[in-house]
């Protein structure tokens, strides 16, 4: 656990006090975004000259002056959901790179950090927090095989809230990319991380601050339960989706998206809408971090979890795989992660008159430990 006094800060310092939103809950609802884009050129998901335009995880842009090459780029940021700045930096890196992993790209030409310091920080708080955030971001980049990838930090801005994120850029050939548009009836839907990370983080903060919601958790759960759930979430949220992206190529995945602020069903629907064929994504399993469903029920927030709409930060990839490849993918994924991460077959793809994603009535909830 982060101990602020060891860094010269007040013992009661909490980074999460410098924001009113946490993690990817800072996103406006998907339908609101669609309303703003409606009737504009930005709305078009397949603009001329773009393989991927608005609405998906990252931009894939053919380079007109360099035929055979494409620019892959994403910009993403969020607000603190943990009090440990170094841990926040690690989660931020995983979250930023995930958008590019969703199209099967695993090499980066540059990664740029986006950082803003809160206007409410003292000079000492700013020096400690920003330094540790940068350390976590950079160390995670190096530890995951990107020691030679340039990390750029152009400027540090002042903002009412502390913001952390980045820009990931890759220039590659078309064979390195898995476009998110080729789902086929009969495909199996695989999810590479459990849901519930954001709620696990929230519960940890309730515990720290002894809130009314924390007292509700104690009616059926212990402090040890909250700690265990938080640790599972940290393990999941700091893990990069790199191995999943590599296995997408090995098993000829048809498309993928990463699960963040719009929730599983929101991102699944967005992916379904992007397909060349009219398809229905039918989700019949929801893998959720241990205790999270119980936590959400105790504090009256279970509806979003039971409907597949819980906000996620640094979530897994939702991948459409040929039916005969799904079991092999899951076995290889567990082996590639040394058994420390799990993937889940959560549904299937069928032909449809209109593309959509739905949660089956008899959905199965799977409690996940890592």
Swiss-Prot record:
InterPro entries, A to Z: PurM-like_C_dom (IPR010918), PurM-like_C_sf (IPR036676), PurM-like_N (IPR016188), PurM-like_N_sf (IPR036921), SPS/SelD (IPR004536)
Gene Ontology biological-process entries: selenocysteine biosynthetic process
Keywords noted in UniProt: ATP-binding, Kinase, Magnesium, Metal-binding, Nucleotide-binding, Selenium, Selenocysteine, Transferase
Binding locations of Mg(2+): 57, 99, 258
Active site: 24
Gene Ontology CC annotations of this record: cytoplasm
Any one GO MF annotation of this record: ATP binding
Expression sites by tissue: First expressed in the midgut anlagen with subsequent expression in a variety of tissues including the gut and nervous system.
EC number annotated for this UniProt entry: 2.7.9.3
UniProt-listed SUPFAM superfamilies: PurM C-terminal domain-like, PurM N-terminal domain-like
Obligatory cofactor(s): Mg(2+)
Cofactor note: Binds 1 Mg(2+) ion per subunit.
Similarity section: Belongs to the selenophosphate synthase 1 family. Class I subfamily.
Subunit structure: Homodimer.
NCBIfam families: selD (TIGR00476)
Protein name: Selenide, water dikinase 2
Source species: Drosophila melanogaster (Fruit fly)
Gene that encodes it: Sps2
């Amino acid at each position: 656990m982060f101990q602020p006094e060891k860094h010269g800060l007040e013992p009661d310092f909490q980074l999460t006090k410098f924001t009113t939103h946490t993690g990817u809950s800072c996103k406006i609802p998907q339908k609101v975004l669609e309303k703003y884009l409606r009737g504009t050129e930005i709305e078009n998901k397949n603009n001329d000259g773009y393989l991927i335009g608005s609405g998906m995880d990252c931009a894939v842009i053919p380079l007109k002056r360099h035929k055979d090459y494409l620019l892959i780029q994403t910009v993403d940021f969020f607000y603190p959901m943990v009090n440990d700045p170094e841990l926040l930096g690690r989660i931020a890196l995983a979250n930023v790179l995930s958008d590019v992993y969703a199209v099967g790209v695993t090499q980066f030409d540059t990664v740029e950090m986006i950082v803003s310091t809160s206007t409410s920080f003292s000079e000492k708080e700013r020096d400690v927090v920003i330094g540790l955030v940068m350390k976590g971001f950079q160390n995670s980049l190096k530890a995951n095989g990107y020691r030679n990838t340039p990390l750029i930090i152009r400027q540090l801005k002042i903002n009412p809230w502390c913001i952390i994120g980045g820009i990931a850029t890759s220039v590659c050939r078309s064979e390195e990319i898995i476009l998110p548009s080729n789902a086929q009836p009969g495909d199996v839907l695989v999810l590479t991380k459990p849901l519930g990370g954001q709620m696990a983080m929230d519960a940890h903060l309730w515990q720290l601050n002894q809130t009314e919601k924390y007292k509700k958790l104690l009616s059926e759960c212990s402090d040890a339960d909250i700690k265990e759930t938080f640790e599972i979430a940290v393990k999941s949220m700091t893990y990069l989706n790199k191995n999943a992206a590599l296995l997408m190529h090995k098993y000829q995945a048809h498309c993928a998206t990463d699960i963040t602020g719009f929730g599983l069903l929101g991102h699944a629907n967005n992916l379904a809408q992007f397909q060349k064929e009219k398809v229905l994504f039918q989700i019949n399993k929801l893998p959720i971090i241990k205790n999270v469903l119980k936590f959400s029920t105790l504090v009256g927030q279970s509806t979003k979890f039971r409907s597949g709409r819980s906000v996620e930060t640094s979530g897994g990839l939702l991948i459409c795989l040929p039916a005969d490849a799904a079991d092999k993918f899951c076995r290889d994924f567990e082996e590639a992660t040394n058994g420390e991460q799990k993937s889940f077959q959560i549904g299937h793809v069928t032909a449809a008159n209109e593309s959509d994603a739905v949660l089956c009535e008899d959905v199965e909830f799977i409690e996940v430990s890592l």
